[in-house]
């Protein structure tokens, strides 16, 4: 239970901290859009598509706002909650135990070939083959 709670706390913290880091790496910084970045290319494409300006409420405008001012408190709470849920899910997931290797140890009483049926190979319906010289 403590492992799951720790994973939830880590997941929430990572989710909240990752947003500004990722936006900064893409080019949406506190000082504006970084030159020659992916954000600059996105803004250029949005401006060309809209006839010279970036529309308010568009993806580029929203990301620029978040990059400059950060997320609101309610957005951080929501993001932290989602990150905590994923962290708890991943932290509480049980891994399947690996199966023993084919030549590895066997349970007591089980010998190789013990449970394998002994069947004769099928006989040819044409009878024995004759090779002529």
From Swiss-Prot:
For this protein, the record's InterPro entries field holds: IFI6/IFI27-like, IFI6/IFI27-like_sf
Where exactly are the transmembrane stretches of this chain? 8-28, 51-71, 73-93
Q: Please give, as recorded in its UniProt entry, the membrane topology of this protein.
A: Multi-pass membrane protein
Signal peptide positions (record): none
Kindly list the GO molecular function terms attached to this UniProt entry: molecular adaptor activity
UniProt superkingdom? Eukaryota
An example Gene Ontology cellular component term from the record? mitochondrial membrane
Sorted keywords for this record are:
Apoptosis, Membrane, Mitochondrion, Transmembrane, Transmembrane helix
Tell me the segments the record calls region Disordered: 93-133
Query: Which biological processes are named by the entry's GO terms?
Result: apoptotic process; intrinsic apoptotic signaling pathway
Tell me where it mainly resides: mitochondrion
Question: Where is this gene product found?
Answer: Mitochondrion membrane
What does the function comment of this entry state?
A: Plays a role in the apoptotic process and has a pro-apoptotic activity.
Name the family the entry cites: Belongs to the IFI6/IFI27 family.
Q: What is this protein called?
A: Interferon alpha-inducible protein 27-like protein 2
Annotated source species: Bos taurus
Starting at the broadest rank, the lineage of the source organism is: Eukaryota, Metazoa, Chordata, Craniata, Vertebrata
């Amino acid at each position: 239970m403590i492992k799951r709670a720790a994973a939830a706390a880590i997941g929430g913290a990572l989710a909240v901290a990752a947003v500004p880091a990722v936006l900064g790496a893409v080019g949406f910084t506190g000082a504006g859009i970084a030159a020659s970045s992916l954000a600059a290319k996105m803004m250029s494409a949005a401006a060309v598509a809209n006839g010279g300006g970036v529309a308010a409420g568009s993806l580029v405008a929203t990301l620029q706002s978040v990059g400059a001012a950060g997320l609101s408190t309610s957005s951080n709470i929501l993001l932290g909650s989602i990150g905590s849920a994923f962290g708890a899910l991943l932290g509480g997931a049980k891994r399947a135990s690996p199966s023993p290797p084919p030549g590895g140890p066997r349970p007591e009483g089980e010998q190789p070939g013990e449970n394998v049926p002994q069947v004769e190979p099928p006989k040819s319906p044409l009878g024995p083959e004759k090779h002529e010289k």
